[in-house]
């Protein structure tokens, strides 16, 4: 990769703490019904996938997330077309900001949990302190989502009453 294409892509720079409206368009940014998936939902899928890689809990996110990562990479490196041998987003240094947060989860969890109505992550912090790993989070408030992203490196999914959101909840978790 050239210096231009190896530039880091940071979700927190795209949506953290700023009052901006972003929408990414690519072949993978469409819902099953053909509507465009909101940017926040795209980042929820990507961040949950990256934080659950290597665990079975990444499965619900895997296909869509890998497509979205490809779209984002292609959009960000549009000026320079370069063949890459790298396999994962980590090897591209994409989204490294998701792992530079104050409250990362343990690599060897004792149990798994989901964080519904997450707020800024108080329940998650308590569960992580007990050795748990969060495999899904949702929060409808936009400001709380931004704080959650900066604290945990994950964009919580939005409205839990939507079927599209429910489809990403892993089947097998402990709490």
Residue spans of the language-model regions?
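Conserved active-site and SAM-binding loop architecture
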Residues: 2-175
């Amino acid at each position: 990769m050239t210096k231009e294409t190896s530039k880091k892509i940071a979700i927190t720079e795209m949506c953290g703490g700023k009052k901006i409206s972003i929408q990414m368009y690519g072949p993978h940014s469409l819902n099953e019904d053909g509507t465009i998936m909101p940017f926040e939902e795209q980042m929820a899928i990507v961040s949950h996938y990256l934080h659950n890689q290597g665990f079975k809990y990444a499965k619900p996110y895997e296909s869509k997330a890998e497509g979205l990562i490809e779209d984002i990479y292609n959009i960000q490196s549009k000026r320079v077309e370069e063949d890459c041998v790298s396999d994962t987003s980590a090897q591209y240094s994409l989204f490294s900001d998701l792992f530079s947060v104050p409250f990362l989860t343990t690599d060897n969890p004792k149990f798994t949990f989901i964080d519904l109505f997450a707020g800024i992550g108080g329940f998650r912090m308590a569960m992580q302190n007990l050795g748990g790993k969060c495999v899904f989070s949702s929060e409808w408030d936009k400001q709380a989502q931004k704080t959650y992203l900066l604290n945990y490196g994950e964009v919580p999914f939005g409205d839990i009453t939507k079927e599209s959101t429910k489809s990403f909840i892993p089947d097998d978790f402990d709490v």
